[in-house]
Curated annotation (Swiss-Prot):
Primary localisation category: cytoplasm
Enzyme class: transferase
Swiss-Prot/TrEMBL GO biological process terms: gluconeogenesis; glycolytic process
Lineage: Bacteria, Pseudomonadati, Spirochaetota, Spirochaetia, Spirochaetales
EC code: 2.7.2.3
UniProt: substrate binding residues: 21-23, 36, 59-62, 118, 151
Protein name per its UniProtKB record: Phosphoglycerate kinase
UniProt cross-references to Gene3D superfamilies, sorted A to Z: Phosphoglycerate kinase, N-terminal domain (3.40.50.1260)
């Protein structure tokens, strides 16, 4: 199902009320990573070029429904002004008379930013009275916040009841690439799924299994699968309550003739600590007194091998304890291999995206998803409220 986009509307002289995802990391009031702001620029610049009056809105952090200047979008307005080369006026609120007055005085091509939507608890509650007030700021609702598309909030889904709703370029791109993976990925299709827990990734594994030719399972959750296969995992993370789930998953993979790659060797430590000394174990079995922390060289070679011929690759989640420097090599290497793959490559999920950005590889990836939880739920095959309201 395709979505309606900004290309389907005439914006000349219209007020475009644009939901962006400006939930950026801040340190002492300074933005430490402006990736999400840059991701919104194509949509903003297009709307401006079409003669729209652009009213931007977003949340930032978790102010819990109260005005808290620590979560003000002022730093975002400053950064937008720099990136766009024009003044982006910061408004003191997201609804109310002062906002209405400023918006009514806007000229075509002007850009303003509303204050943090989550200063009102009604935003997350999708309260109808709040939605109505918000809708008075625009003529057309543009949702470009894929990162919050899995939330049925006032500014992500509610507005579609009061204004014509379309997706921005970022939303369109996410829907196109993630949708292609779910609907008709080109074979061979390799899914690399990492992360610490089976419980948080089993829905993605099960959703992608029927479409995959090869599935690589890494990270902390791999040890539960290795335990099912009869290997010793030492003191590594084990989810006992997911043993049966992992077992039936591996059985189903065999029935579907999907090749599942689990770690063949490991980087281990005596304790799960950042300063632990890495030790290499050249076997699938992990010694009883050791904790699995990362994948080893043999596993990496195997992953590299399957990626050479892959036509479609999805990578979600780290292959080891990426946040500990000594145990981040597996994830870093996989980032390199995915970037070198000649097929369509899609990377989603916080740590895998961080790895790609850390090593400046994002330009070599077909699509780096901006949505953490939203990407995950999309890949699980769930209907996302923020996308559903945009469907043609």
């Amino acid at each position: 199902m395709s979505i309606k986009t900004i290309k389907d509307c005439d914006f000349a002289g219209k007020r475009a009320l644009v939901r962006c995802d400006f939930n950026v990391p801040l340190k002492e009031g300074n933005i430490t990573d402006d990736t999400r702001i840059r991701a919104a620029l194509p949509t903003i610049e297009y709307l401006k070029s079409q003669g729209a009056r652009v009213i931007l809105m977003s949340h930032l952090g978790r102010p819990k429904g109260e005005k808290n200047l620590k979560y003000s979008l002022m730093p975002v307005a400053k950064r937008l002004s720099e990136l766009l080369g024009q003044d982006v006026k910061m408004l003191p609120d997201c609804i109310g008379d002062e906002v209405a007055t400023t918006v009514s005085c806007m000229k075509n091509g002007d850009i303003v930013l509303l204050e943090n939507l989550r200063f009102y608890k009604e935003e997350e509650e999708n309260c109808d009275a709040f939605v109505r007030k918000l809708s008075q700021n625009g003529d057309i609702f543009v949702n470009d916040a894929f990162g919050t598309a899995h939330r049925a909030h006032a500014s992500t889904a509610g507005l579609a009841a009061y204004l014509p709703a379309v997706g921005g370029f970022l939303m369109e791109k996410e829907d196109e690439f993630l949708g292609k993976i779910l609907r008709n990925p080109e074979s061979p299709f390799v899914a690399i799924i990492g992360g610490s827990k089976v419980s948080s990734k089993i829905a993605v594994l099960e959703s992608l299994l029927p479409k995959s030719n090869v599935m690589v399972i890494g990270g902390g959750m791999a040890y539960t699968f290795l335990k099912v296969e009869g290997y010793s995992i030492g003191q590594s993370l084990l989810e006992n309550e997911y043993i049966d789930v992992a077992s039936s998953f591996l059985k189903k993979a065999k029935e579907l003739d999907v090749k599942v790659i689990l770690p063949l060797d490991h980087v281990v430590a005596s304790e799960f600590r950042e300063d632990s000394i890495p030790e290499y174990v050249d076997s699938v079995d992990i010694p009883n007194d050791k904790v699995g922390m990362d994948i080893g060289e043999k596993t990496l070679r195997k992953i590299e091998e399957v990626l050479v011929s892959a036509k479609t690759v999805i990578w979600n989640g780290p292959l080891g304890v990426f946040e500990f420097n000594s145990f981040s090599k597996g994830t870093a290497k996989v980032a390199e291999y995915v970037a070198s793959c000649s097929g369509i490559t899609v990377v989603g999920g916080g740590d895998s995206v961080a790895a790609v950005n850390k090593f400046n590889l994002s330009e070599k990836i077909t699509h780096v998803s901006t949505g953490g939880g939203a990407s995950l739920e999309y890949l699980e095959g769930k209907v996302l409220p923020g996308i559903k309201v945009l469907e043609k």
